[in-house]
UniProtKB/Swiss-Prot annotation:
UniProt keyword Ribosomal protein present: yes
Protein name stated in the entry: Large ribosomal subunit protein bL33
Source species: Allorhizobium ampelinum (strain ATCC BAA-846 / DSM 112012 / S4) (Agrobacterium vitis (strain S4))
GO aspect biological process, one term: translation
InterPro entries (alphabetical): Ribosomal_bL33, Ribosomal_bL33_CS, Ribosomal_bL33_sf, Ribosomal_zn-bd
Alphabetically ordered keywords of this record: Ribonucleoprotein, Ribosomal protein
The keyword RNA-binding appears for this protein: no
GO cellular component, one term: cytosolic large ribosomal subunit
PROSITE patterns from the UniProt entry: RIBOSOMAL_L33 (PS00582)
């Protein structure tokens, strides 16, 4: 079987609250680390989330 093109990643909050989102990305087209601005309910504001690996 071939290797899957989409992988699961964890988007971890940069506000150091420990909150994260789990999403998928295409590893062939998006080779660099993903960053997104999303809502952190613990900090109660929009902050930047950076990609980390799911362990």
């Amino acid at each position: 079987m071939a290797k899957a093109t989409t992988i699961k990643i964890k988007l971890l909050s940069t506000a150091d609250t420990g909150f994260f989102y789990v999403t998928t990305k295409n590893s062939r087209t998006m080779t660099d680390k993903m960053t997104k601005t999303k809502y952190d309910p613990i900090a109660r504001k929009h902050v930047e989330f950076k990609e980390t690996k799911i362990k």
